[in-house]
Structures are given as structure tokens and as C-alpha cells.
Design a protein with these regions (language model features):
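Active-site mouth loops of central-metabolism enzymes
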Residues: 25-41, 85-88, 138-164, 209-214
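Hydrophobic faces of well-ordered beta-strands that scaffold small-molecule active sites
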Residues: 26-31, 53-57, 82-84, 99-101, ...
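Glycine/Thr-rich beta-alpha phosphate-binding loop at enzyme active sites
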Residues: 149-196, 237-239
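N-terminal amphipathic alpha-helix/helix-capping segment at the start of soluble metabolic enzymes
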Residues: 1-31, 41-42, 123-133, 140
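Catalytic cores of alpha/beta
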Residues: 43-44, 84, 88-102, 198-230
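Surface-exposed amphipathic alpha-helices with a cationic face
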Residues: 20-21, 68-78, 172, 196-204
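Conserved anion-binding
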Residues: 91-172
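Glycine-rich phosphate-binding active-site loops on the catalytic face of alpha/beta enzymes
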Residues: 56-62, 98, 102-113, 183-186, ...
Length: 241
């Protein structure tokens, strides 16, 4: 595992690149700011695994104020880089170290492909937050997720690996700096190792995988298949990590 380092602004993507080039595994804990509770978050921050390299903050239905409060508190209590994983442009706060500037590539909803990004410009142009263009691809995790409901899109079938690979490559060709394969919060089925292997073989940019990973074995399987970063949320909240 890569050594934990505090990353200042403009350094987060370099960290991703270096880790991918050196085959070092990144690990992120995802905090959903909805229903933010200081006591609960304080307890969770104290038990963050030693191999954690980043904190992601975001959710599909959180408010801007919830996100701001969560980011501010986590930054005060934790030295790891805090990266926004927004479900809406209103979740953006300049207090974070970086922003995954998500484009939902797996659906046909223009709101989450480009319109949300346009709406965010007035917020972002006056900040120095590191912006990382990210191709976000929903993979069927066996249940309907909050992202599906909010975006009104359907995930790609795990059986259609060619389509998933082509979608990831389309993201890379259009200038994305990361590809994020997402099975969804609480997914029954995680992104298969076959998908991870195929996408990693095809792209030349770092690969993030999240959703449905509940055990250390599943975590290591994702790394071996080619994930540069694995994101865990629900399993950490439940004490499995």
C-alpha cells in the first residue's frame, strides 16, 4: 500500500498518476454528508484503516450546507486529502482539496453528462480547488441505487463488457483523467474482476472502482484485477473495514 501523505491543492491527481504508474494501491473511505452527525463521524474517523489514502465526501441527496459542514469537520480532524464526490453542483465547496468533476457516461441524461457541469462553473471559477475530470460509469450492482433514481438512468449490464470498455475509452478519448466504475451504494454485486481487468487493459488513465465491496478479499481482488483506487462506504460504516 502507498504511504499516507497529506496532499495540498493541485497534488491529488499527481498522487493518482504516480500510484498508477508505480502499481501502488489507493484506498478511499466515502462519507455521505446527508444526516451528518459529529459524534458518529468522529468515531468513524478514529477507526479509518491505516492503508487509507483519501477521503471522499459526497452523496446523491445531501444538501450544500451538509456537505460544507462535513468537509470542514473532516479537514479539521484528518490529515488525508478530502476529495468531493458530488451528486449535484450545489454540493461543491472550496474547502475540499479536490473535486471529481463527474460526467455520467453510462446514461442518456444530459443533465448529468454536461448540464450539471455547466451549472458548477460560476462556483468553480472563483476557487482554487483541484478539478479532476472523471468519467463516471454505473454498473449493474443488482439493486436500484440512489444514483439511478436521481439521474433517472439505467446502469450498464455486467455481461456487456465490450460496451463498458468502449464507454470507458470514450471517456478517456474525450479528455477524462479518471474512470470510475460504480456498482452503487449497497450493491449486491460488486463490479466483476473481469470488467475491471478489461477496462484497465484498455485505458491508460487511473481507474477507480466502488460499490459492493465488503471484505478484504474482495478489496484485494479488485486491486489484482487492475483498480488503482478502491472506494468503500457502506461496509466501512457498518464496521466491516
Amino acid at each position: 500500500m502507498i504511504k499516507n501523505l497529506k496532499k495540498s491543492k493541485k497534488e491529488v491527481y499527481t498522487h493518482f498518476q504516480n500510484a498508477a504508474q508505480n502499481r501502488q494501491s489507493l484506498f478511499a473511505i466515502l462519507f455521505d454528508p446527508e444526516g451528518f452527525d459529529v459524534t458518529s463521524i468522529e468515531i468513524q474517523l478514529k477507526r479509518i484503516p491505516k492503508n487509507t489514502t483519501h477521503i471522499l465526501v459526497g452523496g446523491s441527496t445531501a444538501t450544500q450546507s451538509q456537505t460544507q459542514v462535513a468537509v470542514r469537520y473532516i479537514k479539521e480532524q484528518c490529515k488525508l486529502p478530502v476529495v468531493l464526490f458530488p451528486g449535484d453542483y450545489r454540493h461543491i465547496t472550496a474547502q475540499a482539496d479536490a473535486l471529481l468533476f463527474l460526467s455520467l457516461l453510462s446514461g442518456d441524461n444530459a443533465e448529468y453528462l454536461i448540464h450539471q457541469q455547466i451549472k458548477s462553473v460560476d462556483i468553480l471559477r472563483d476557487t482554487d480547488i483541484e478539478i479532476i475530470p472523471t468519467g463516471y460509469i454505473l454498473i449493474d450492482g443488482g439493486i436500484e441505487t440512489a444514483v439511478q433514481r436521481v439521474s433517472n438512468t439505467r446502469p450498464l449490464s455486467q455481461n456487456n463488457i465490450d460496451l463498458i470498455v468502449n464507454t470507458a475509452l470514450a471517456g478517456q478519448y474525450s479528455g477524462k483523467k479518471l474512470i470510475y466504475l460504480e456498482a452503487g451504494s449497497g450493491a449486491v454485486n460488486r463490479v466483476s474482476v473481469q470488467i475491471i481487468e478489461a477496462v484497465k487493459k484498455a485505458i491508460t488513465i487511473p481507474l477507480i472502482v466502488g460499490g459492493g465491496i465488503r471484505t478484504q478479499q474482495q478489496l484485494q481482488d479488485a486491486y489484482r484485477a487492475g483498480a488503482d483506487m478502491v472506494v468503500v462506504g457502506n461496509a466501512f460504516e457498518k464496521g466491516d473495514f
